[in-house]
């Protein structure tokens, strides 16, 4: 619902105020390193893990790393788009370099 409302508000501001808007829907971002963070280990992004509510990919990675069976909640029929952090950063960079 909120993404739909966002789109309607963006359309409104574009038509009424001539605001140029780029809205990026990238899915779930995974990974911890980018070219910038590779320059210094103190810049590495956090790897958040939450057994119940965290990103399924992070949960699966943690469970696999410790030899724990992968836990699937619900029916297992959920689908989500995943994008690596390097690709996400590149997407934002391209959007900034090519405004509407």
Stretches with model-predicted labels:
Residues 22, 71-72:
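A local structural micro-motif
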């Amino acid at each position: 619902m909120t993404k739909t409302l966002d789109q309607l508000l963006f359309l409104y501001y574009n038509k009424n105020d001539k605001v140029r808007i780029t809205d990026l829907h990238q899915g779930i971002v995974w990974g911890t390193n980018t070219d910038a963070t590779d320059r210094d280990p103190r810049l590495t992004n956090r790897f958040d893990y939450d057994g119940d509510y965290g990103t399924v990919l992070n949960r699966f990675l943690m469970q696999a790393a410790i030899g724990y069976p992968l836990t699937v909640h619900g029916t297992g029929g959920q689908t989500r788009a995943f994008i690596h952090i390097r690709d996400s950063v590149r997407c934002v960079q391209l959007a900034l370099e090519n405004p509407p």
